């Protein structure tokens, strides 16, 4: 019964399908009927096709689904721009750039007149004037392509070879983005290279500083840094790191870096590594000098006064990651830089080298060896505190991987500063002793003068009294007066001889002192001349930029503009 029912159902289904095919047009029949049965099509005979068996799986654990062809819901691809459209866009871009350049020249002329009249320009106005002057000077070689006939045909090739030939107003957004991506890649590569080279250099071991006694603070820090206990991670406070970092001068660190390290550092600072080692050092020094001056102006005007683009440029020039970073993070990074540079007096070279370790920003899970006791007391640490710990950790990594020459130079500087302080104290003591010895003969000379004055007073009183007395024996008195006069005459040359001897001694002592001073000065001049000859033989590029701030200049930084007094008093005559 089951087979009959299933067979009947199959017949009815087949008849229905044949009926559907029969009632369709010849197009459908030709497409559904094989070619071997086409002769029967004219007679209206339709062949009976056996239906294929269908098997269904009884396993319900796996659901077999046929792949469905994806429906194309994506937007249609944009057609490529034609040559005329590209030319129109280029002409419009250069027209807008020309208008912008003219407007900047107009504004910069007013700023130049303001500066010529003696007014002080702000940081934004100074950058505007500098950028416009650079664009105007770039127009000089660019004008040659406009003056020379048919030279504009070679302009695309010239721009390909020299991309900075055009002023900054003609730079497109794609070019800016390409420069940013290239700068990020270069900084990543150079930071990795600096890490490897600093780690491969000869580090300081415990044996090299074991016998030192005078530089306790300096050597204890490195002893703690390189002799970590087993199972414990040594931590350092911010005060310890800043105190040791201040001992490494900018010039001493730069002078002892190798050629590959200088080239990588110049690339990291967006400088071209062209020339010998002295030229690279000169370029890095001049760039750092500009950054140091810019730090003071930003600190005075306030970080909040900068726009988004100005914050981006300031962070990029200092080696920070700025692309894709929010404005709040840029402000925090710049505040941390100013705190370490101006308040803590950390050298700029160490700051740039530490930025190679902190280029990626704050990691998600970080453990810092540097901590601040003030920040630890807070319940919730701010992002500023985390960034401060990150930068101190970067400085600590730079100090832990400093080569031997830099360490030895810093160690000598510390010992020389201590020995010079001891020498100055000894010189002061010797000078005080000389002053005391000079004061003693003056004190002894004062009683002699007083005694002679008393004798003269007594003699005058005696001469005044003698006329009143009764003279009995005039001869005896005259004899006594003659004897007294002779004694006085004999006493006067002795006193004059003693005075001349004392004066000769004083003059001889002064002359000897002056001669000694002149001899010392001549020796110092000879040493300086020898050192100058050695420097002239070594160095070919004059480098007179000194990045180390003087001790006298280590005063309180200027008061920011927002904290300054809003009123002032003018004294009237």
Curated annotation (Swiss-Prot):
Which GO terms of type biological process are on file? intracellular potassium ion homeostasis; positive regulation of mitochondrial translation; potassium ion transport; protein insertion into mitochondrial inner membrane from matrix; proton transmembrane transport
Region feature Disordered, mapped onto this chain: 417-455, 477-573
| Major site of localization recorded for this protein | mitochondrion
Q: Which residues form a coiled coil?
A: 408-440, 503-541
Membrane topology designation: Single-pass membrane protein
Tree of life domain: Eukaryota
> Which regions of this chain are Mitochondrial intermembrane-facing, per the record's topological domains?
57-138
Q: What does the entry list under GO cellular component?
A: mitochondrial inner membrane; mitochondrion
Q: What does this protein do?
A: Involved in mitochondrial potassium homeostasis through the mitochondrial K(+)/H(+) exchange regulation. With MBA1, plays a role in ribosomal translation and protein insertion into the inner membrane.
Q: What is known of its domains?
A: The matrix-exposed C-terminus contains a 14-3-3-like domain which is necessary and sufficient for interaction with mitochondrial ribosomes.
In Swiss-Prot or TrEMBL terms, this protein is called Mitochondrial distribution and morphology protein 38
Organism annotation: Saccharomyces cerevisiae (strain ATCC 204508 / S288c) (Baker's yeast)
């Amino acid at each position: 019964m089951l087979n009959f029912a299933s067979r009947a159902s199959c017949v009815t289904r087949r008849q229905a399908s044949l009926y559907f095919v029969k009632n369709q047009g010849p197009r459908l029949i030709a497409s559904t009927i094989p070619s071997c049965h086409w002769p029967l099509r004219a007679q209206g005979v339709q062949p009976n096709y056996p239906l294929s068996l269908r098997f269904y799986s009884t396993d319900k654990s796996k659901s077999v689904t046929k792949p469905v062809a994806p429906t194309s819901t994506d937007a249609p691809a944009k057609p490529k721009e034609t040559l005329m459209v590209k030319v129109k866009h280029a002409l419009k871009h250069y027209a807008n750039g020309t208008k912008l350049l003219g407007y900047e020249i107009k504004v910069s002329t007013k700023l130049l007149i303001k500066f010529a009249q003696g007014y002080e320009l702000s940081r934004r106005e100074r950058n505007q004037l500098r950028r416009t002057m650079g664009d105007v000077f770039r127009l000089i070689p660019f004008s040659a392509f406009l003056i020379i006939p048919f030279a504009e045909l070679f302009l695309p090739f010239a721009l390909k070879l020299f991309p900075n030939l055009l002023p900054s107003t003609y730079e497109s957004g794609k070019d800016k983005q390409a420069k940013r991506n290239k700068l990020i890649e270069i900084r990543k590569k150079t930071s990795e290279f600096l890490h490897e080279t600093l780690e491969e250099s000869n580090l300081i071991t415990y044996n090299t500083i074991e016998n030192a006694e005078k530089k306790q603070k300096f050597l204890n820090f490195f002893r703690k840094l390189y002799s970590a206990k087993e199972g414990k991670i040594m931590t350092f406070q911010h005060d310890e790191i800043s105190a040791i970092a201040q001992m490494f001068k900018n010039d001493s660190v730069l002078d002892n870096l190798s050629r590959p390290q200088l080239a990588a550092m110049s690339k990291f600072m967006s400088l071209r590594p062209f020339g010998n080692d002295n030229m690279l050092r000169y370029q890095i020094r001049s760039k750092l000098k500009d950054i140091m001056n810019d730090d003071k102006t930003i600190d005075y005007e306030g970080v909040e006064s900068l726009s988004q683009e100005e914050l981006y440029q300031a962070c990029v020039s200092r080696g920070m990651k700025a692309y894709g970073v929010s404005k709040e993070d840029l402000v925090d990074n710049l505040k941390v830089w100013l705190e370490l540079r101006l308040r803590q007096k950390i050298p700029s070279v160490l700051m740039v080298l530490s930025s190679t370790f902190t280029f990626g920003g704050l990691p998600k899970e970080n453990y810092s060896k540097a901590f601040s006791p003030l920040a630890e007391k807070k319940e919730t640490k701010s992002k500023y505190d985390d960034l401060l710990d990150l930068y101190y950790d970067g400085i600590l990594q730079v100090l832990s991987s400093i080569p031997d020459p830099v360490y030895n130079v810093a160690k000598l500087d510390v010992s020389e500063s201590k020995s010079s302080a001891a020498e100055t104290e000894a010189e002061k003591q010797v000078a005080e002793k000389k002053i005391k010895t000079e004061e003693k003969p003056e004190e002894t000379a004062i009683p002699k003068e007083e005694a002679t004055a008393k004798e003269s007073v007594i003699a005058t009183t005696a001469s005044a009294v003698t006329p009143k007395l009764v003279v009995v024996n005039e001869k005896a008195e005259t004899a006594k007066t003659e004897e007294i006069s002779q004694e006085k005459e004999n006493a006067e040359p002795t006193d004059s001889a003693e005075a001349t001897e004392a004066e000769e001694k004083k003059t001889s002592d002064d002359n000897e002192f002056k001669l000694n001073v002149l001899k010392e000065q001549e020796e110092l001049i000879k040493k300086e001349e020898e050192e100058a000859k050695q420097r002239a033989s070594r160095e070919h590029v004059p480098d007179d930029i000194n990045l180390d701030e003087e001790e006298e200049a280590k005063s309180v930084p200027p008061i920011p503009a927002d904290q300054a007094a809003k009123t002032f008093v003018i004294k009237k005559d």
